[in-house]
Regions:
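Short functional linear segments
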Residues: 1-48, 55-57, 61-68, 73, ...
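N-terminal-biased segments
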Residues: 2-22, 88-89, 139-147, 162-174
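Short, surface-exposed alpha-helical segments at coil->helix boundaries
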Residues: 24, 98, 207-211
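ATP-dependent carboxylate-amine ligase catalytic core
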Residues: 31-32, 36-39, 65-157, 173-175, ...
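Aromatic/hydrophobic pocket-lining residues that form π-stacking "cages" and hydrophobic walls in ligand
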Residues: 59, 128, 210
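Acidic, Mg2+-coordinating active-site environments of NTP-dependent enzymes
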Residues: 111-112, 136-143, 159-225
Length: 225
């Protein structure tokens, strides 16, 4: 879980580092030094146990039909490292990935940072944010990697929609041991005043937790029923 890397190439990147120190604060600091690329577009943040990838694909297809420029960050990657980062359904190229990685390397050697601080997923996430800022998009469809509250993707600032697919039992002992505990962790992607949408037929305990968190954040709460 805590394998580390010098961030030199995509294949040398480490695994997830979940709940190892304050990951969100670290990522926010990295993004700030990089001029907050995540603030350059509107974010649709997708979280859940099942159906995240298909939901992301449908949302991107709808937005493209409306002529919006759309970035997508999905996990796990299917096929190559690069097809988890797409702009208008086209993968980031190796040259583009390497160019954004070089910017991260320059940050991680600054005082207060260290080259082995980031995990694979965290570095890929920052690459995606930089890529979408450098190749402008209107929306980014952002898929959580693990959980919600402590997931790297929860470091973003400009979340317009928080979308929840079906929440069930996953990553037991890491995210929680019950649907309610897991839903609580995932609900933390809801942002103040945004729009929160839950999948139809959400489990009752998960539904109530999402609804309560949305109310606490003064977010509009919608069910796709």
């Amino acid at each position: 879980m805590a394998k580390q890397s010098n961030l030199t190439t995509p294949t040398s990147l480490p695994d997830f580092m979940y709940n190892v120190g304050d990951r969100i604060d670290l990522l926010k600091r990295v993004l700030k030094v990089l001029d907050n690329p995540d603030k350059q577009f509107k974010i649709i943040h997708i979280c859940g146990t099942n159906g995240k990838g298909s939901t992301a694909t449908m949302i991107v297809a709808i937005l493209r039909q409306l002529n919006y420029r759309v970035g997508t960050f999905t996990s796990p990657f299917i096929g190559t490292l690069y097809n988890g980062i797409q702009r208008n359904f086209s993968d980031i190229s190796k040259a583009q990935f390497d160019s954004e990685m070089a910017k991260i390397q320059h940050v991680m050697v600054r005082p207060g940072f260290n080259h082995d601080m980031l995990s694979e997923f965290e570095a890929q996430f920052v690459v995606a944010m930089l890529f979408f800022a450098d190749h402008p998009v209107d929306y980014v469809v952002l898929e959580c990697g693990l959980g919600g509250e402590l997931d790297a993707t929860n470091a973003v600032s400009n979340t317009m929609y928080s979308v929840f697919t079906e929440i069930g039992l996953d990553h037991l002992g890491i995210l929680g041991n019950t649907v309610a505990e897991i839903a609580t962790t995932k609900s933390k992607i809801i942002r103040q005043g945004n729009t929160t949408i839950t999948a139809p037929h959400q489990r009752p305990e998960a539904f109530q937790i999402l609804k309560s968190q949305a109310a606490a954040k003064q977010a509009t709460f919608l069910s796709a029923d």
